[in-house]
């Protein structure tokens, strides 16, 4: 899987909105929307995948501790 495909998979599995993804990867909502829709060849990078993954893994760890 490419980094872009991995991000799309996470978005689908966690049912994330563009604004939540944007916050996790430190990008604007419009940039995130363009990348999600693959407009003009815009795709998520490896760094953005890592940021998104780490952001939500940390949240899940906090839930697990409860």
Residues covered by each model-derived region:
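A short, Lys/Arg-rich alpha-helix, primarily the initiator
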Residues: 1-14
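Short, charged recognition helix plus adjacent turn
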Residues: 9, 34, 61-66
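The alpha-helix within a helix-turn-helix
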Residues: 11, 22, 53
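Short, flexible helical or helix-coil boundary motifs
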Residues: 14, 18, 59-64
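Short alpha-helical "recognition helix" segments of helix-turn-helix
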Residues: 19-25
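DNA-recognition alpha helix
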Residues: 25-26, 56
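Recognition helix of helix-turn-helix/homeodomain-like DNA-binding domains
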Residues: 27-43
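DNA major-groove recognition helix of helix-turn-helix/homeodomain DNA-binding modules
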Residues: 45-63
